[in-house]
Amino acid sequence: MSNPAPPSPTSLHRALGLSDDELDDIRKVLSREPNHLELALYAVMWSEHCSYKSSRLHLRRLPSKAAHVLVGPGEGAGVIDAGDGIGVAIRIESHNHPSAIEPYQGAATGVGGILRDVFSMGARPLAVMDPLFFGELDDARNRWLVEGVVSGISGYGNSVGVPTIGGELTFDQCYGANPLVNVLAVGALPTSRLALGVASGIGNYAVLLGSLTGRDGIGGVSVLASAGFSGEDGAASIDEAKRPSVQVGDPYEEKRLIEACLELLDHGYVVGIQDLGGAGLICATSETAAKGGVGMDVDVTAVPLRELGMQPFEVMTSESQERMLAIITPENLAAVNAVCDKWEVRATVVGHVVEPALMPDGSRVGLLRVREGFDGEVLGEVPASSLADEAPLYDRPRRRPRDLDAILADDPSDDEPVGDPHDDLAGLLVDTAWVSRQYDSQLFLNTVVGPGRDAALLRLAGPGLPPSRRGFAVSTDSNPRWCALDPRNATALTVAEGVANLACVGASAQAIVNCLNFGNPEHPEVMWQLSESIDGMAMACDALSLPVIGGNVSLYNESGGRDIDPTPVVGSLGVVTSLVAPPPGWNWRAGDAVVLVGHREAAGGRAFPLGGSRWATRRGRRGGRLAEFDASRLRATFDFVTGEVAAVCAGEPSDLTAVHDVSGGGLAVALAEMAAATTLGVSVDELEGHGELFAEFPGRFVMATSDAGALVARAQAAGVPVSVLGVVGGTRLRLGTLVDLDVREMADQRASALERALRRD
């Protein structure tokens, strides 16, 4: 075609976030100068958020294949075969930058977007989890962010009818100007309903489903997540400038869209389907066309608009929420319209699938043409694959932080502990129930274990699913304190922590997803952290036979040139083969023996490492070395605990009465949490001081049993270390000679700690 508009000024590409080299790449693809519209399309699709141009080379090192994986990375969500003809879809995403600017809408639309990723696969969304990271609560702005984000998640999730079943809540000064809002969603589908985001069938229609298109979210996450905050006073200095890039959500529209899409898929009316997330319509059209090896003509004048006077680039890149793109045959259009009318969902033909174009060299290329009318002027024409798959990939410089050796050498494990261990323990006990009380975790009545425990557990049941006694479990885990010291080992240990949490509810780990939250990739130290973290994840997943079936990379989490600590979040998915009874939970009983299952001492050079521990951080110590990742001993312990708890879930006779993973805060916190859950105390005599109380490393479980001899014998037969700690009873928590607390007073303090911190005004 002839160039449909004058060439763009040379400065425009920079204003859109494209480099000079990237402009040259675009010229080579097109063999001409791009026009304004085409530059805008490349700017959003080649942004860091959409293209992963700084991380994709490294992500290739992650294992993603296994016999039970139905869909791996690259689609809306990963999907595993959970058995009984049921697939489970899982996805995790970040909405960090939008939430820093507009916490309610940023978090709410994060939930909406992740749900669309899941039901685009044909899965009914069944649950949401939310790992959240904020600055310290002595800052009023951080308290405002916490309340806004939690309200946004609860407002959207409760209204759309999907339970929020858990997550994480972390406070650290590094997130003061750049909070992290990650959202994980899980859904289930009959495997016969599995859908993919592929356009095929020449002459088929591209149908836009859902909300009107407006200017909200123009260049939203694709721009916000591709640059840091520049203000020295944090995000506040640029809030107003970037606020229009934050999308606005409507959960009731989303609910209707879910039901309409699932009914369309049930009837077989849909050839391919994809949500409109980051980069909006241009992302959905270019990606579906590229996957199908076809071209697509899109009529911008056909798109239903909420605002007058929108320009073509605005229509194509708007990130207005609650929209899907479905590829359907002309024969099914009337039936599709009937279903959408039933659910009061707009359905508009905005495009056609077309033959790949014959190029001068004889090759065929699927072109994406943006038109003014289906037979009207071509406003822009680019190869679909060049937008979706061919962004330049950068192997950015990497450098180990120069001060890291000094930080590692400052090891709190070497110190003689000082201070009151009662205060230490009290400062580590925070119940996040204030957050979970705002979420409805029991929607659908399938939640067996909800927020606040090691992992969430749900029955694998829902409308349209085959009957099954199976269940699925989900956990989210992270440890930025560890990752700041040793991102490779720390990420491996975080993967192990996720498997440990699943074991506590009897679930066998099947797959993980990740959300990699890091600072500015243009800083070599940040790229070193990211590369090391990915290698650690690959190491652990290979050792524990876990495929990585999806993920998200969030970069440029910085403010005023200060990067956040590396924060890889691992979402772990497990399956319980027979779920006819709840797992034991934390509810030990008077007279039970309390047993530590797993190696009492850490792998590596230190028996009880305090480096990166919550205990040390609370004392202002952020250095030291971590335990080593030892796959062989971890796997044996995980298999044993999973089997013990799975037997309870299957309704088999068992002496096991309670189980809890030892993680953040160490053994002291695990015992205190179990005591607080029941107001029953325990006395533990033989402990190796502060180190054994507060050291953190995965692979240890506190289990309560009515028959210590039987449990010990089974553990020993499995080759798993085990030691009896004490007996449940009384009203005091006694840990060696260091801790002696009234359980009820401790439980009350723990229950109110977070709300007191939020209400300090």
Question: Model features per residue range: what roles?
Answer:
Residues M1-P73, G83:
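Alpha-helical propensity feature that highlights long, continuous alpha-helices across diverse contexts
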Residues P4-L16, D20-E22, I26-L39, A177-P179, ...:
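Glycine-/charge-enriched secondary-structure boundary and capping motifs
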Residues D20-R27, A40-A43, R56, V111-L115, ...:
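Predominant activation on well-ordered alpha-helical scaffold segments within soluble catalytic domains
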Residues L57, P63-A67, S151, L169-D172, ...:
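Intrinsically disordered, low-complexity boundary segments flanking structured domains
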